[in-house]
Amino acid sequence: MATCADILRSEFPEIDGQVFDYVTGVLHSGSADFESVDDLVEAVGELLQEVSGDSKDDAGIRAVCQRMYNTLRLAEPQNQGNSQVLLDAPIQLSKIMENYDCDTKLPGLLKREQSSTVNAKKLEKAEARLKAKQEKRSEKETLKTSNPLVLEEASASQAGSRKESRLESSGKNKSYDVRIENFDVSFGDRVLLAGADVNLAWGRRYGLVGRNGLGKTTLLKMLATRSLRVPAHISLLHVEQEVAGDDTPALQSVLESDTVREDLLRQERELSLRIAAGRAEGSEAAQLAEIYGKLEEIEADKAPARASVILAGLGFTPKMQQQPTREFSGGWRMRLALARALFARPDLLLLDEPTNMLDVRAILWLENYLQTWPSTILVVSHDRNFLNAIATDIIHLHSQRLDGYRGDFETFIKSKQERLLNQQREYEAQQQYRQHIQVFIDRFRYNANRASQVQSKLKMLEKLPELKPVDKESEVVLKFPDGFEKFSPPILQLDEVDFYYDPKHSIFSRLSVSADLESRICVVGENGAGKSTMLKLLMGDLSPVRGIRHAHRNLKIGYFSQHHVEQLDLNVSAVELLARKFPGLPEEEYRHQLGRYGISGELAMRPVASLSGGQKSRVAFAQMTMPCPNFYILDEPTNHLDMETIEALGQALNNFRGGVILVSHDERFIRLVCKELWVCENGSVTRVEGGFDQYRALLQEQFRREGFL
């Protein structure tokens, strides 16, 4: 096949050497920039027109460019145009020069000394156009990572019910049950739910469970925005975003969430002022009396005390309850959003992973509080103990459908196993029955005497319901690489460490802790007690004000932050993310690393922003383990992970040959992994000999003393 150089020589035999070198250089170095033949014509067309001496018209020049463009595209996969070749032997330029006299010109230079018949200005313009095109392409690549990615939004559709529509429009629908039948939910071209039904009975507490990325959070959003039709008379609240910070005190912010009470108080103030000023009409005194009656009915005078109890249960001290909301961090504002929802008492409360923002103490309080919740709750949670404590029903999202189960999570596990076992038995029994009938049909298909029986058997097969084999969810397996040499203690320790950000507020005083490669340590304590600060001291990210941090010279720490999503570039794929962090490896290596944590196939090539919370966590695990650390420090690693992945993470940490220190609020995960429990409080860290059972008992006793139980 002719090369671009061959095409140039055959079409333009008189082409100048300098122009020939320039055009071939443009063709090879800029081939990636030619998205169409028009780009190639724009780059070299004028030069070739000049070279032809007007012997070729525009169509002729375009035809030549088309031939060269086709040649470039065909050669592209091999990518051999600019490949480097290893020489068989070194070239000695001095030996070559000996064959020429001093006045003799080298052959290559003779060509370059020939006069050029091409307009120099046109040559400069062509070079400028090519440079501009390359800059434009580079700018596109920069924008790809700097601009926030615009993701597709979820959509929902559902079958309508004329009866329900008539009841809704007439105002006769007084039921507080939520019943949505035969609906679909999709995210772009991905179908999350197809022909699904959801039934939420008034006063029941539903736990919504399922693997990461199947659409649990999306379903909550569809309900919260009423994209799925929820009766208009049912009030609902979705705890999703943190409270905006302003000068409103935390306690007042919670009180304002009860819009009915706030509206009545506003009317009471306005009427009282009018009556006091002598401007009231005769009926307004009666209106004021009616408002007082309504305020008494909703126990408005007890509202501040009730709001204060909720805030205290979620960890707000009396001083914090009077602080402006703008002074709180994002985590505390999320707690404030939860407090507002609990205080407002909607007919349908939607909670998405509420325990992620809470410490163990606040979770135990929330469990106790929700057990007496009067209306309906739908909560997404991967905390088994939390669901066992609060759920009356479980909704399982899988295979694009929703299956309902009565009872808490442990009851759900047993019921699901029994259902799957029965489903498999029914399927196998029907398959045997079908085979038995099919044998009869095949045997007597061409027997005229048995024709009626064969037809009868065929009809029997047609009438049998179509049973499908059980969809078994794939097992989640995680493994942390541990191909490193063991080394002797001391491995990692803090000795008599003092630390503070502000000298007036000490965080740690004379802190002494240590860990080795056998350690499985869990750190618990209230938010703000210094758990994350201690982890940063152990890693060396923070330096002690006084005292010593000692780390073994061979120690290699892998760190998982509870804010790991903020450290990921959300605009690129998971594969590209690893390639940028650890350059120089083949793409298959990055894919293999991601596959170890369940990010495989199409998932690995999707923008990280489009992944679910749990899938983003898996990407963070893949990134953390890539350098093969021998010690892991994990800050809330179970946030957003589904239950199967939490179990797999626990097993992987137990099998890991190095050391582990983690902060977690997940009781089951703590019991699964940890051999040692540290409690962080009052500027120190103490070891609890009785483990989590003793710590839980201490918290329950504290609740009783404070009047929460």
Swiss-Prot record:
Function: Displays an antiviral effect against flaviviruses such as west Nile virus (WNV) in the presence of OAS1B.
Ranges of biased composition (kind: Basic and acidic residues): 129-143, 161-171
Annotated residues for binding of ATP 2: G525, E526, N527, G528, A529, G530, K531, S532
Keyword match Ribosomal protein: no
Ranges where the record places region Disordered: 129-171
Taxon lineage: Eukaryota, Metazoa, Chordata, Craniata, Vertebrata
Keyword 4Fe-4S listed: no
Family membership: Belongs to the ABC transporter superfamily. ABCF family. EF3 subfamily.
Any Pfam family matching the protein: ABC_tran_Xtn
Protein name as annotated: ATP-binding cassette sub-family F member 3
Residues that hold ATP 1 according to the record: G210, R211, N212, G213, L214, G215, K216, T217
Annotated disulfide bonds: none
GO molecular function, one term: ATP hydrolysis activity
Positions of the ABC transporter domain: 178-424, 492-707
Modified residues (N-acetylalanine): A2
Organism: Mus musculus
Gene field: Abcf3
Phosphoserine: residues bearing it: S83, S155, S157, S161, S283
Any one biological process term the GO annotation gives: defense response to virus
Keywords annotated in UniProt: Acetylation, Antiviral defense, ATP-binding, Nucleotide-binding, Phosphoprotein, Repeat
